[in-house]
């Protein structure tokens, strides 16, 4: 059984499965999800134990597994990425968020993290998902560090988004979280 859930030229949208352990809405995840959605891609989110997350990956069959991780979550994220890879899943794992941005060498040094996204992730993630969907390479996408053939490709940072570029982003995809009872009455 091929446990790398890649669309590779099938002409359908790509899927990203966000994995998180904190029951709070992450604004960066919601803005990236909205941008992906507006370009025909799909995002889902998974909470739970390592076993529940692995089961969720099998159920959703994503093209990319993504974490937005604060340093306080780093130990948990390492354990979950190891459990995912140990289960035989080969889908690329992307680690973004403040930990990857502030401590990129630490983030990419974990052997079960395939890609880290530094700084703003909206357009790097869109480019990555488009590349995964089309079967194109993604080793030159700015803001991404990629583990490939045992080496790390450290792409340069792209310029930060300007105020007009930030204003042009779609509204946050709050529906990503609202399917969970915990968030249905969330006041924001």
Label each region the model flagged:
Residues 6, 164-167, 171-188:
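Radical SAM [4Fe-4S] cluster-binding motif and immediate context
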Residues 15, 21-22, 32-35, 39-163:
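Glycine-rich beta-alpha loop elements in corrinoid/cobalamin-binding modules
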Residues 23-27:
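Glycine- and acidic-residue-enriched helix-capping/strand-helix junction motifs
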Residues 11-18, 28:
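Generic start-of-chain signal for non-secretory N-termini
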Residues 1-12:
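Short, Lys/Arg-enriched N-terminal segments with co-localized hydrophobic residues
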């Amino acid at each position: 059984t091929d446990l790398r859930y890649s669309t590779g030229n099938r002409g359908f949208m790509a899927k990203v499965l966000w994995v998180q352990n904190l029951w709070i809405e992450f604004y960066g995840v919601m803005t990236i999800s909205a941008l992906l959605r507006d370009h025909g891609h799909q995002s889902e989110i998974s909470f739970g134990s390592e076993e529940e997350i692995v089961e969720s990956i099998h159920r959703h069959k994503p093209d990319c597994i993504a974490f937005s991780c604060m340093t306080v979550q780093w130990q948990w994220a390492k354990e979950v990425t190891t459990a995912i890879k140990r289960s035989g899943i080969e889908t690329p794992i992307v680690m973004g968020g403040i930990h990857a941005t502030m401590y990129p060498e630490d983030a990419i040094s974990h052997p079960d993290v395939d890609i880290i996204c530094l700084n703003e992730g909206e357009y790097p993630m869109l480019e990555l998902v488009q590349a995964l969907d089309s079967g194109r390479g993604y080793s030159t996408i700015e803001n991404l560090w990629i583990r490939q053939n045992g080496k790390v490709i450290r792409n340069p940072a792209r310029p930060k988004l300007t105020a007009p570029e930030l204003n042009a982003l779609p509204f946050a995809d709050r529906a990503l979280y609202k399917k969970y009872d915990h968030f249905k009455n969330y006041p924001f």
